[in-house]
Amino acid sequence: MKSEIKKNDMVKVIAGDDKGKVAKVLAVLPKTSQVVVEGCKVVKKAIKPTDDNPKGGFIHKEKPMHISNVKKA
């Protein structure tokens, strides 16, 4: 589905827990009709210890949301 929303556009979230937020689009996923919006739908993900990061820990990461839940600001 063709969309007018592109990477680095400013969008307003119109549905969900982050309703009303205005933020920048980090990525557009056209095959699944989803977008990743900066600071919206953030989840805490556990990271296993590795050689680079022997302690492991948690990171905060944005998950994609459906494109119908945002509009251009």
Swiss-Prot record:
One of its GO terms (biological process) is translation. Residues 51-65 have a biased composition (Basic and acidic residues). GO terms for molecular function: rRNA binding; structural constituent of ribosome. The keyword Nucleus does not apply. Residues 51-73 are annotated as: Disordered. Part of the 50S ribosomal subunit. Belongs to the universal ribosomal protein uL24 family. HAMAP family: Ribosomal_uL24_B. This is Large ribosomal subunit protein uL24. The lineage of its organism: Bacteria, Pseudomonadati, Campylobacterota, Epsilonproteobacteria, Campylobacterales.
